[in-house]
């Protein structure tokens, strides 16, 4: 009898120490919007004895409005032809910016 009471009191003591109040906010934090890496594209090729041409382009979003409708991006590129009967061409550089507006759906 005394052993049963001792075990019951021990269980009550353990249960009271483990009983924590639940936190007020049990919801998960919202997932942040994805951060896309720099968008790079490239290519090249040529015929035998014709040299080799290649080009690289890139685009990066630099600003987006809070509502997501306005967006500004920067883009640039580089291209050149190497070798062939006329030798190397001058490098071709491209730099620009883009503005995008997304119309709301009515």
From Swiss-Prot:
Signal is among the record's keywords: yes
Propeptide: 20-23
One GO term describing the cellular component: extracellular region
Localisation: Secreted
Key words, A-Z: Antibiotic, Antimicrobial, Immunity, Innate immunity, Secreted, Signal
Stated family: Belongs to the attacin/sarcotoxin-2 family.
The protein, known as: Diptericin A
């Amino acid at each position: 009898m005394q052993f049963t009471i001792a075990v019951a009191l021990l269980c009550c003591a353990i249960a009271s120490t483990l009983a924590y109040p639940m936190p007020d906010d049990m919801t998960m934090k919202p997932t942040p919007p994805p951060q896309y890496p720099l968008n790079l594209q490239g290519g090249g090729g040529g015929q035998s004895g014709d040299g080799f041409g290649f080009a690289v382009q890139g685009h990066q979003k630099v600003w987006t409005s809070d509502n997501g409708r306005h967006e500004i991006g920067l883009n640039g590129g580089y291209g050149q032809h190497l070798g062939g009967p006329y030798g190397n061409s001058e490098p071709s550089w491209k730099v620009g910016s883009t503005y995008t507006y997304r119309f709301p759906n009515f």
